[in-house]
């Protein structure tokens, strides 16, 4: 039975390029999940967009001496160019700079305000007398009071993931000039998170299918007690407050950006000429998944659900399969600290499926994982080239050369051959279960294990020897290996769409796997075949030294 799946994916700040940490953390797992569900025949809407507001953009604009709008648009266009290179299959990708988004965010604000979930309060905020202005969140840096990380910001600690405010930081300073700010009174609007504490605890305690790290982090945070949080800032860049007399204030980006999932859904529906079509993806009969990095967990498991509870009539998240951090040399990738491997740079030298494979096999699902160029080369050469790619190349080349470029007759199969076919069908069932439960590393491991089993079968049968004495026996062995390849093209498709599409074509099925379903299709005897090209290219060992040198390591 088909399902309806909504996939919301973290909105990247439009202040720098995409790096591998972003891809492994949110965008690749979301794309894998979307492709899998489409192949199953489910209704899928996967949305995201560029976060054009917030202090990361204004900080960069000030550094470059241009407007925040210019910075945001530059990187939004770069993101738009990067997604196809990565094979990210958005149903809709937009930005927070649209009139539709501003309207949707303001409607959410007014709804919560009118229901008493947003209120005004006078608070002390950091003010830099040297720069003569209030300092919103990321304009203040200091030491985290919880984990003592010295690079924490006035909105959050990237090291331990806890949301903060500037007053909590130790040894705080203005990011712009380095001087310690003073605190002055200013009026802001607050989201009454405390009103949702008990309801959120009851709701989260039902989420036993969540990843352990996400569930434990959320429950621990909730049971410490929720504090009301300011949702406005003294800025001139962002979504204006929809109330008179507050022209100098904007909606705080953490409140505004999560509303993007809703505004993007509405914009998608309008683009289809069906302005109400978004509603079915926000009803109770839809499963909503939010793919994010671990620094965004509380915003998606606590704050966004609280906003949805307050608004009413909108579906709460079913799952928030947050990943941990991808590191390099045990350091977190960071745009703001310029410690990263940039996506466009990597893809200018290596195939997209090679990158997607390593990031999938090494995905930081339950703990931080380290990106290594040595591992990148090893997995490409040993697993993609020597195992999976070699299986496809030698089977299809032998078939095309010896059976007139057609799928051969195979006759009666022996027990060993039937066992491999059964294992292929079982692998598809097992990967289906793993993917359904967002266990991506397990799914790709199962697929590669089947490729290894198919190679063992081929080595046992040795059709290159059989063909010299019994062409019919060789045909049986090669046909069974083609069945295994047919299963592998499906299992690998969510992870490696480019090579899976080519393999599918070489097997005579065509390249549109999503239309076929998550099933094992048997190659059709007599089907014309195209001689294959290698699915993957071997990398030289020198790549390790070259790439580490580029990183300055």
Swiss-Prot record:
The keyword Zinc applies. ATP binds at residue 335. It comes from the Bacteria. A motif ('HIGH' region) lies at residues 12-22. Its cofactor is Zn(2+). Binds 1 zinc ion per subunit. It catalyses: tRNA(Met) + L-methionine + ATP = L-methionyl-tRNA(Met) + AMP + diphosphate. Keywords: Aminoacyl-tRNA synthetase, ATP-binding, Cytoplasm, Ligase, Metal-binding, Nucleotide-binding, Protein biosynthesis, Zinc. It is an enzyme of class 6 (ligase). GO terms for molecular function: ATP binding; metal ion binding; methionine-tRNA ligase activity. Its EC number is 6.1.1.10. Disulfide bonds: none annotated. GO terms for cellular component: cytosol. Zn(2+) binds at residues 144, 147, 157, 160. GO terms for biological process: methionyl-tRNA aminoacylation. Signal peptide: none annotated. Is required not only for elongation of protein synthesis but also for the initiation of all mRNA translation through initiator tRNA(fMet) aminoacylation. Belongs to the class-I aminoacyl-tRNA synthetase family. MetG type 1 subfamily. This is Methionine--tRNA ligase. It comes from Dehalococcoides mccartyi (strain ATCC BAA-2100 / JCM 16839 / KCTC 5957 / BAV1). The gene is metG.
């Amino acid at each position: 039975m088909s399902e309806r799946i909504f996939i919301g994916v973290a909105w990247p700040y439009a202040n720098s390029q995409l790096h591998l940490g972003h891809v492994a953390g949110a965008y690749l797992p979301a794309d894998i999940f979307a492709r899998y569900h489409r192949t199953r025949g489910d209704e899928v809407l996967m949305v995201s967009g560029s976060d054009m507001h917030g202090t990361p953009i204004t900080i960069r604009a000030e550094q470059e001496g241009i407007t925040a709008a210019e910075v945001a648009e530059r990187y939004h266009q770069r993101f738009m160019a990067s997604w196809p290179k990565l094979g990210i299959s958005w149903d809709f990708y937009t930005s927070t700079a649209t009139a539709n988004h501003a309207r949707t965010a303001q409607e959410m604000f007014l709804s919560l305000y009118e229901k008493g979930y947003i209120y005004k309060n006078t608070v002390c905020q950091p003010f830099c007398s040297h720069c003569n202005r209030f300092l919103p969140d990321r304009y203040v840096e200091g030491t985290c009071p919880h984990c003592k990380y010295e690079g924490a910001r006035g909105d959050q600690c990237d090291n331990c993931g806890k949301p903060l405010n500037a007053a909590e930081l130790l040894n705080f300073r203005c990011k712009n000039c380095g001087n310690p700010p003073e605190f002055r009174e200013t009026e802001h609007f607050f989201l009454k998170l405390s009103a949702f504490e008990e309801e959120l605890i009851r709701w989260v305690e039902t989420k036993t299918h969540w990843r352990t790290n996400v569930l434990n982090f959320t429950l621990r945070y909730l049971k410490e007690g929720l504090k009301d949080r300011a949702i406005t800032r003294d800025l001139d860049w962002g979504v204006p407050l929809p109330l008179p007399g507050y022209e100098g204030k904007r909606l705080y980006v953490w409140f505004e950006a999560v509303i993007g999932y809703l505004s993007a859904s509405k914009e998608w529906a309008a683009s289809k000429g069906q302005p109400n079509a978004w509603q079915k993806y926000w009803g109770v009969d839809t499963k909503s998944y939010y793919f994010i990095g671990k620094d965004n967990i509380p915003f998606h498991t606590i704050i966004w659900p609280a906003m949805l509870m307050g608004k009413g009539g909108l579906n709460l998240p079913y799952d928030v399969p947050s990943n941990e951090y991808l590191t390099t040399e045990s350091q977190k990738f960071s745009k703001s600290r310029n410690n990263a491997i940039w996506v466009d740079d990597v893809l200018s030298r290596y195939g997209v499926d090679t990158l997607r494979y390593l990031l999938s096999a090494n995905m930081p699902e339950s703990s931080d994982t380290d990106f290594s160029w040595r591992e990148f080369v090893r997995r490409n050469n040993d697993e993609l080239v020597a195992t999976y790619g070699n299986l496809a190349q030698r089977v299809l080349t032998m078939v095309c050369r010896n059976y007139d470029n057609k799928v051969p007759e195979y006759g009666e199969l022996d027990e060993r051959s039937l066992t491999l076919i059964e294992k292929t069908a079982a692998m598809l069932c097992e990967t289906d279960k793993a993917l359904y439960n967002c266990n991506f590393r397990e799914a790709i491991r199962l697929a590669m294990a089947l490729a290894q089993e198919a190679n063992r079968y081929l080595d046992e049968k040795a059709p290159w020897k059989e063909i010299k004495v019994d062409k019919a026996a060789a045909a049986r062995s090669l046909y069974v290996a083609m069945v295994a390849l047919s299963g592998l093209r499906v299992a690998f498709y969510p992870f490696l769409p480019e090579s899976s599409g080519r393999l599918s074509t070489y097997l005579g099925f065509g390249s549109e796997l999503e239309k076929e379903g998550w099933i094992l299709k048997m190659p059709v005897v007599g089907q014309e075949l195209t001689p294959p090209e290698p699915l993957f290219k071997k990398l030289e060992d020198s790549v390790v030294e070259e790439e580490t040198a580029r990183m300055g390591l």
